[in-house]
UniProtKB/Swiss-Prot annotation:
One of its GO terms (cellular component) is peptidoglycan-based cell wall. It comes from Mycobacterium tuberculosis (strain ATCC 25618 / H37Rv). Its EC number is 1.1.1.-. Gene3D superfamilies: NAD(P)-binding Rossmann-like Domain. The active site is at Y164. It comes from the Bacteria. SMART domains: PKS_KR. One of its GO terms (biological process) is fatty acid beta-oxidation. Belongs to the short-chain dehydrogenases/reductases (SDR) family. This is Putative short-chain type dehydrogenase/reductase Rv0148.
Amino acid sequence: MPGVQDRVIVVTGAGGGLGREYALTLAGEGASVVVNDLGGARDGTGAGSAMADEVVAEIRDKGGRAVANYDSVATEDGAANIIKTALDEFGAVHGVVSNAGILRDGTFHKMSFENWDAVLKVHLYGGYHVLRAAWPHFREQSYGRVVVATSTSGLFGNFGQTNYGAAKLGLVGLINTLALEGAKYNIHANALAPIAATRMTQDILPPEVLEKLTPEFVAPVVAYLCTEECADNASVYVVGGGKVQRVALFGNDGANFDKPPSVQDVAARWAEITDLSGAKIAGFKL
């Protein structure tokens, strides 16, 4: 199958960890890769070119095609330049893996607006900026593949990560609508929540767990989602440690009221409303 052969894929946050592995895997499968990384610290401070350059050199040493980009996804101009790098170097852009991210953890009681805003700017706004810059090219060529990095912190919650969880679940809302708007243009958008040992998780999970969670388990799934053959759209996957699973929202049959209910009416049927024993994949309609 063609896979990603001769496709141009942008990977943001590709200077290390999961992003690096995504870039290496895609290049190994024949894609031309834009290796974007600001080169900063885990909390988003600082910048540098070494991280992206090293990944590009590694790809080229193996006979692959790659170019480095050091712009920030958190600004419209930076994102536009990331896509421009793909167009200038390879003449097209066929896919985006929105992976760039930072961490500024803290309980909600102590969450400053600065730390809330910084995380949303990179994860959620960063996803918007880069995809918005690529979108006209996807539409024009009637082809595009989008993979955003969500997180179990957004899907299920995680103590001390209100900013991160909100941003990551926001990306799921983004791909749900991109999938609808892009379908007629053969643009598919999916989300993947990776569980892997990287600098983002090195002090969150115990060492005996981290050693089983290498990025190599995750990257092939990301690469497959970038292929033309993958027909999935608006789907969310949790991947790590050898397990690949789809997750989705579920809904039950609920309760129907013929007239506006009282609080007591709602309370009387609350068990029926909340019972998920017969739940099915959710979609809302009256």
